[in-house]
Amino acid sequence: MAATTAPNPLTAYRFLLRATRIAFQGDFTTLHAARAEARKQFDQHRKQGVDTPMRIQHAMETAEILRTNVVQGVKISGAGEEAERYASILVMRRFRGEYEGEDERREKEEAMRELRIHEHIERGDNDSIKTAGKNERVKVAVGKACSNTQSSE
């Protein structure tokens, strides 16, 4: 059997840069900030150390999360004016004591965004979430340590 080796730092760095390009495509400011942070982290830990494999693994996992789980919302053009009008109505309602918070305004503003979902985004269905964990049983024994609470049937 061949032992699996951790990728080298250059491979992890390139993988992270590719992930930022995919996740933040079209948003130059965020893309630049993410790449600058990646470079800063790699430069700070340039010398080999005991924790180098752990840091490389962290970079690979971060890249995977960026690539598969980060979705950006783009404000829909023309929605800004409607959102401003809606916000001013809420301010008036709050002044009259009809409305207490800003949650409704935030929800309305968030609804006026278009999500940029690309082909790498991990997709799931709600059915798998609803049925998750229904077939598993856990026995709790009274008087035992926490590490001994689970047992298989």
Curated annotation (Swiss-Prot):
UniProt cross-references to InterPro entries, sorted A to Z: Complex1_LYR_LYRM7 (IPR045298), MZM1/LYRM7 (IPR050435)
Main location: mitochondrion
One term under GO cellular component: mitochondrial matrix
Biological processes, Gene Ontology terms: mitochondrial respiratory chain complex III assembly
CDD domains per record: Complex1_LYR_LYRM7
Molecular function per GO: protein folding chaperone
UniProt entry keywords in alphabetical sequence: Chaperone, Mitochondrion, Transit peptide
Compartment(s) of residence: Mitochondrion matrix
Taxonomy, superkingdom: Eukaryota
Oligomeric and partner information: Interacts with RIP1.
Function per UniProt: Assembly factor required for Rieske Fe-S protein RIP1 incorporation into the cytochrome b-c1 (CIII) complex. Functions as a chaperone, binding to this subunit within the mitochondrial matrix and stabilizing it prior to its translocation and insertion into the late CIII dimeric intermediate within the mitochondrial inner membrane. Modulates the mitochondrial matrix zinc pool.
Membership in a protein family: Belongs to the complex I LYR family. MZM1 subfamily.
Name this protein carries in UniProt: Mitochondrial zinc maintenance protein 1, mitochondrial
Species assigned in the record: Ajellomyces capsulatus (strain G186AR / H82 / ATCC MYA-2454 / RMSCC 2432)
Classification lineage: Eukaryota, Fungi, Dikarya, Ascomycota, Pezizomycotina
